Amino acid sequence: MTERFDCHHCNESLYGKKYILKEENPHCVACFEELYANTCEECGTPIGCDCKDLSYKDRHWHEGCFHCSRCGSSLVDKPFAAKEEQLLCTDCYSNEYSSKCQECKKTIMPGTRKMEYKGSSWHETCFTCQRCQQPIGTKSFIPKENQNFCVPCYEKQYALQCVQCKKPITTGGVTYREQPWHKECFVCTACKKQLSGQRFTARDEFPYCLTCFCDLYAKKCAGCTNPISGLGGTKYISFEERQWHNDCFNCKKCSLSLVGRGFLTERDDILCPDCGKDI
């Protein structure tokens, strides 16, 4: 007796018929398609064994149903894009959804690298420095009057040049006599200490810290021999080409302050009228 060879589902004999194995169990074509065939997203009918089953993200189509939702062109073996569960050819997707390049006004195709800034988009090769025309890419840039500049070009064209080192001032800076300086370049002419944020004065247009200015140029007190800066409201007495701090202008003998008083001189000394009686 011949061994039976039947469909695992309907038990119909498979001798002389097409069959399909599923987990090593034979099925007739009709049962296999009923039980296991995927349903086409487009037409809603099973995708039979004699048809190509095209799939995308767990969705399936007959080969003839796999087309653009807008223009109907076939997407078989062509690039496509998905938008809200619909499949679109690249032309239809670009026309409806792709951004336009701010520079060349052409569509930025899906999958193409693009640059975005403040709501505008560029092809990567179109996002260039206004001055040198080189692509900016992921490098730093500076916008100026609706134009974009790479940092070196911006500094050459717009940044102030330090009067001392002649290099661009990109941050901060100091203005002295209407000329720009880097903070680190604006230093005392004598000791080279930075003057930014410090009190300073000038001699022949050269800046000096107060200490160096006093040491170099200030008059010396005839009493204590220390410099009289004359800065910041410092008061002093001047008499016959000699100067004294107010606190140092005292009688040589009794140390009485002579500020606002009459006095006498004895050689290099100054005396109050009472001490001067003995001269």
Curated annotation (Swiss-Prot):
Q: In its UniProt entry, what is this protein called?
A: Four and a half LIM domains protein 2
Q: Its gene?
A: Fhl2
This entry's Gene Ontology molecular function terms read: bHLH transcription factor binding; identical protein binding; transcription corepressor activity; transcription factor binding; zinc ion binding
Report the protein's function. Answer: May function as a molecular transmitter linking various signaling pathways to transcriptional regulation. Negatively regulates the transcriptional repressor E4F1 and may function in cell growth. Inhibits the transcriptional activity of FOXO1 and its apoptotic function by enhancing the interaction of FOXO1 with SIRT1 and FOXO1 deacetylation. Negatively regulates the calcineurin/NFAT signaling pathway in cardiomyocytes.
Coiled-coil annotated residue ranges, if any: none
Which SUPFAM superfamilies does this UniProt record tie to the protein? Glucocorticoid receptor-like (DNA-binding domain) (SSF57716)
**Presence of the UniProt keyword Repeat in the record:** yes
The annotated crosslink position for Glycyl lysine isopeptide (Lys-Gly) (interchain with G-Cter in SUMO2) is: K78, K167, K220
Q: Which UniProt keywords apply?
A: Cytoplasm, Isopeptide bond, LIM domain, Metal-binding, Nucleus, Phosphoprotein, Repeat, Transcription, Transcription regulation, Ubl conjugation, Zinc, Zinc-finger
Q: In residue numbers, where are the C4-type zinc fingers? A: 7-31
Entry's localization field: Cytoplasm; Nucleus; Cytoplasm, Myofibril, Sarcomere, Z line
Comment block on domains? The third LIM zinc-binding mediates interaction with E4F1.
> Which Gene Ontology CC terms are recorded?
nucleus; Z disc
Question: Which positions does the record annotate as the modified residue Phosphoserine?
Answer: S238
Q: Taking every annotated instance into account, which residue ranges of this chain make up the domain LIM zinc-binding?
A: 40-92, 101-153, 162-212, 221-275
Tissue expression pattern:
Highly expressed in heart but also detectable in brain and skeletal muscle.
Q: According to the record, what induces this protein's expression?
A: Up-regulated in hearts exposed to isoproterenol (at protein level).
Subunit details for this protein? Interacts with ZNF638 and TTN/titin. Interacts with E4F1. Interacts with GRB7. Interacts with SIRT1 and FOXO1. Interacts with CEFIP. Interacts with calcineurin. Interacts with FOXK1.
Biological process terms from the Gene Ontology for this record are: atrial cardiac muscle cell development; heart trabecula formation; negative regulation of apoptotic process; negative regulation of calcineurin-NFAT signaling cascade; negative regulation of transcription by RNA polymerase II; osteoblast differentiation; regulation of transcription by RNA polymerase II; response to hormone
